[in-house]
Amino acid sequence: MGKPGFSPRGGGGGGGGGGGGFRGRGGGGGGGGGGFGGGRGRGGGGDRGGRGGFGGGRGGGGRGGGGGGGRGAFGGRGGGGGRGGGGRGGGGRGGGGRGGGAGGFKGGKTVTIEPHRHEGVFIARGKEDALVTRNFVPGSEVYGEKRISVETNGEKIEYRVWNPFRSKLAAAVLGGVEQIHMPPGSKVLYLGAASGTTVSHVSDVVGPEGLVYAVEFSHRSGRDLINVAKKRTNIIPIIEDARHPHKYRMLVGMVDTIFADVAQPDQGRIVALNAQHFLKNGGHFVISIKASCIDSTAQPEAVFAAEVKKMQADKLKPQEQLTLEPYERDHAVVVGVYRPPPKQ
């Protein structure tokens, strides 16, 4: 039986093997939208594979079902994880459908690590490729992600797979963003840190010389964040409302980059306030915008354009914008510079 201890009973027989181990005994009508593996029935094995990414069973087609891992970065061999490995479910942990474990980093396979053009980010090339960061705390994981150990020049280095379905920043990197402005040794103010999933990877990227100030308002997520920070000396957790930067001004020094993923209607203002307090002139910002959080009635494109206009008024000069398809719907990432020095 799979990890969660229940087994949704659909109509008809036919035992499908869902990714994360939901045995989905349903036949016929495919796995529910939540992506419990659809049975062997005619249905779309696992209806889009659900963003939870427990891959559809051996059923036909469905965007995440039997027909091979979808578009994502690490899909399983035979009907692997949801829209490409493992969606938010965490790197397709269960063996996807018929195939082997989604991810292809089973022992014995030769995995080579290449540096990504963003310093501190790497690509693991194996049976399937994945985005990885060098683990700051070897031997421990943060949210159940896969770890890969590679031996170079006699020393073992451990990397953690960075899942674009769980992290907006990873989605932006895989989407081809030009700059993330977080080289090793830089100081980053991270607004909307949640449980510390992405924060842990930023901590990997900036490395032992860098610092991540992680601001999160929710006490529930804050507890997880503090637990992540206990092991990672370069994360400073701040459980405070990002709307009131003066409350944590004693904790935060000047930073090189602000990353914001706050999903609030006034997030442009939140970033501007924090930039005025902590961002050095010529420093950069990376903002993840969720259109439906700002105006759920307008077209996403119109929302993004309006936000960019607001930023310009606050001396935040956007330099690039890209949407996060296929990893997130109606999300965009805007990267830019704060108070750029006048051109000579």
Curated annotation (Swiss-Prot):
EC number per UniProt: 2.1.1.-
UniProt binding sites for S-adenosyl-L-methionine: 197-198, 216-217, 241-242, 261-264
Comp. bias regions, Gly residues: 8-107
Sorted UniProt keywords: Methylation, Methyltransferase, Nucleus, Ribonucleoprotein, RNA-binding, rRNA processing, S-adenosyl-L-methionine, Transferase
Signal peptide: none
Enzyme class (EC, first level): transferase
Residue(s) carrying Asymmetric dimethylarginine: 9, 23, 25, 40, 42, 48, 51, 58, 63, 71, 77, 83, 88, 93, 98
GO molecular function, one term: RNA binding
Pfam families the record matches: Fibrillarin (PF01269)
SUPFAM superfamilies documented for this protein: S-adenosyl-L-methionine-dependent methyltransferases
Predominant location: nucleus
InterPro entries membership: Fibrillarin, Fibrillarin_CS, SAM-dependent_MTases_sf
GO cellular component terms attached to this protein's record: box C/D methylation guide snoRNP complex; Cajal body; dense fibrillar component; nucleolus; small-subunit processome
Protein location: Nucleus, Nucleolus
Record's comment on post-translational modification: By homology to other fibrillarins, some or all of the N-terminal domain arginines are modified to asymmetric dimethylarginine (DMA).
Entry keyword Mitochondrion: no
Biological process according to GO: box C/D sno(s)RNA 3'-end processing; rRNA methylation
SMART domains: Fibrillarin (SM01206)
Keyword set includes Transferase: yes
Record note on quaternary structure: Component of box C/D small nucleolar ribonucleoprotein (snoRNP) particles. It is associated with the U3, U8 and U13 small nuclear RNAs.
Family: Belongs to the methyltransferase superfamily. Fibrillarin family.
Primary role: S-adenosyl-L-methionine-dependent methyltransferase that has the ability to methylate both RNAs and proteins. Involved in pre-rRNA processing. Utilizes the methyl donor S-adenosyl-L-methionine to catalyze the site-specific 2'-hydroxyl methylation of ribose moieties in pre-ribosomal RNA. Site specificity is provided by a guide RNA that base pairs with the substrate. Methylation occurs at a characteristic distance from the sequence involved in base pairing with the guide RNA.
UniProt name for this protein: rRNA 2'-O-methyltransferase fibrillarin
Organism of derivation: Drosophila melanogaster
Classification of source organism: Eukaryota, Metazoa, Ecdysozoa, Arthropoda, Hexapoda
The encoding gene: Fib
